[in-house]
């Protein structure tokens, strides 16, 4: 199921909720970001590539330790200044993400947008990777794990609840409560 459509007459709001990976795009953006880092020599090829594949398999099998994975996947952000990271991210989006954006997803999003529905993406992939992808679809609302950013740098840690499994439900509940105010 590509998305969830909710209508709540108490608030007169129609909400279309989308996943990102293998729904709006034809692959997994988190895994592709890791491969991008390996291919550009930004991270140690042998260690990072092997670990990235293992975490992706764990994810597909439903056995992923999200905290362990976030420590792994966010660590490269702490090793480089933000401006360099943004340049790499732009290159990543142009070279690996734009070619796999799904036309059917764009059409569905456009239909919901034209109907006046509120659009929301909920993803287990971190906000650093996903925010520009979601913006390409014209969606302003995103629930994703937020990498910690202090003193102009990413720390390699995350803020709040990871947006994964039950965490997605908790973050959605909080978002709905905030949106109703």
Where are these regions (language model features)?
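Conserved active-site and cofactor/substrate-binding residues in soluble primary-metabolism enzymes
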Residues: 28, 80, 167
């Amino acid at each position: 199921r590509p998305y969830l459509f909710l209508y709540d007459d108490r608030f007169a709001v129609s909400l279309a909720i989308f996943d990102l990976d293998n729904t709006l795009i034809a692959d997994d953006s988190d895994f592709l970001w890791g491969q991008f880092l390996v291919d550009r020599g930004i991270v140690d090829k042998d260690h990072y590539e092997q670990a990235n594949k293992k975490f992706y398999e764990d994810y597909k099998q439903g056995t992923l330790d999200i905290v362990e994975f976030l420590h792994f996947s966010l660590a490269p952000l702490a090793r480089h200044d933000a401006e360099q990271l943004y340049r790499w991210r732009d290159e990543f989006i142009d070279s690996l993400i734009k070619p796999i954006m799904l036309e059917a997803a764009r059409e569905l999003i456009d239909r919901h947008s034209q109907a006046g529905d509120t659009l929301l993406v909920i993803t287990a992939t971190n906000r650093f990777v996903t925010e520009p992808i979601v913006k390409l679809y014209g969606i302003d609302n995103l629930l994703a794990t937020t990498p910690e950013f202090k003193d102009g740098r990413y720390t390699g840690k995350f803020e709040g609840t990871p947006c994964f499994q039950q965490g997605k439900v908790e973050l959605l509940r909080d978002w709905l409560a905030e949106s109703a105010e």
